[in-house]
């Protein structure tokens, strides 16, 4: 990645970022892998947007093919009003469960949109298009239950990318719940043994957009890293640890330290294999 600074005048500077490009270096196919990709920018029950989340998901679909080696027929993408609670749950309980080859399939989950924690921080939720922030238990997807449903399909591995936060803040300036004026710190939770989870921010932080690139900040550097930027030792493979290190360093820099991506699980898991 290169960052260019153009000075139109002594007092102004415009930073521009390279366009994302999933083409380029070829990767080895991952025949049995599959991906469920979800992005919700605009919601039915709240005016607070998750800016660029839908385009993040649509572009990540190309990276799933071109950089994770997944066949297009084994990728399911849900965006905006197509990512309601029913559609999300059926995609996991029906489509994913049928598509997984037990102990052979690597599963990839990408979610960009709003997340929320319970008032005590003990539960983490992903908000579907038709979810109501004030009724999390009834209308949102509990992260632990989502992971349990995926794990029940018995895949070989599961890698989850979450461009969301759980503090109740948004990619803009709004709070998801007006009656909750302060950010809630989500408590760290355990994950199943074969899961690796990369999240955009710490439990009490906001997952921000990268306005210059018109993507979520985490999503932009995630995909830029998958192009090859994250291959720190130049061995033609990108591990979860390498990708996380690249994303974390760039997000911390661009957010001036206010957003710190986190990694749970196997840092040595190879995600991208260049030919």
Specify the residue positions occupied by each region the protein language model found:
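Functional beta-strand-loop-alpha-helix junction segments that form "active/interaction loops"
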Residues: 11-22, 57, 61-105, 137-138, ...
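Short acidic/polar inter-strand loop motif in beta-rich domains
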Residues: 4-12
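Glycine- and acidic-residue-enriched helix-capping/strand-helix junction motifs
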Residues: 44-58, 62, 209-213
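Caspase-like (clan CD) cysteine peptidase catalytic core
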Residues: 32, 86-112, 116-175, 242
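Extracellular S/T/G-rich loop segment that most often corresponds to the catalytic His/Ser-adjacent loop
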Residues: 158-220
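Short glycine-rich His-centered loop
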Residues: 31-48
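Active-site-proximal beta-strand/loop segments in catalytic clefts of secreted hydrolases
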Residues: 36-41, 78-82, 110-114, 127-131, ...
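Caspase-like cysteine protease fold
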Residues: 17-19, 23-26, 230-275
């Amino acid at each position: 990645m290169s960052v260019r600074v153009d000075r139109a005048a002594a007092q102004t500077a415009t930073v521009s970022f390279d366009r994302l490009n999933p083409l380029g270096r070829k990767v080895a196919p991952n025949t049995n892998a599959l991906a469920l990709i979800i992005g919700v920018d605009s919601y039915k029950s709240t005016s607070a947007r998750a800016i660029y989340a839908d385009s993040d998901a649509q572009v990540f679909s190309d990276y799933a093919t071109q950089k994770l080696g997944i066949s297009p027929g084994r990728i399911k993408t849900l965006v905006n009003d197509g990512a309601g609670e029913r559609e999300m749950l059926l995609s996991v309980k029906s489509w994913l469960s049928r598509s997984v080859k037990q102990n052979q399939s690597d599963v990839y989950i990408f979610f960009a949109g709003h997340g929320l924690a319970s008032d005590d921080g003990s539960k983490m939720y992903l908000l579907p298009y038709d979810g109501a922030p004030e009724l999390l238990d009834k209308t949102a997807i509990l992260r632990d239950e989502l992971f349990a449903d995926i794990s029940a399909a018995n895949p070989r591995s599961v890698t989850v990318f979450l461009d969301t936060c759980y503090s109740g803040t948004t990619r803009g300036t709004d709070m998801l719940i007006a009656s909750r004026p302060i950010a809630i710190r989500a408590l760290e939770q355990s994950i199943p043994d074969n899961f690796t989870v990369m999240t955009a921010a710490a439990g009490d932080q906001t997952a921000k957009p990268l306005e210059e690139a018109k993507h979520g900040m985490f999503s932009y550097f995630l995909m830029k890293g998958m192009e090859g930027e994250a291959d720190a030792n130049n061995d033609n493979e990108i591990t979860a640890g390498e990708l996380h290190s690249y994303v974390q360093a760039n997000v911390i820099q661009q957010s001036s330290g206010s957003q710190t991506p986190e990694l749970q699980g196997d840092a040595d898991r190879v995600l991208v294999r260049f030919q």
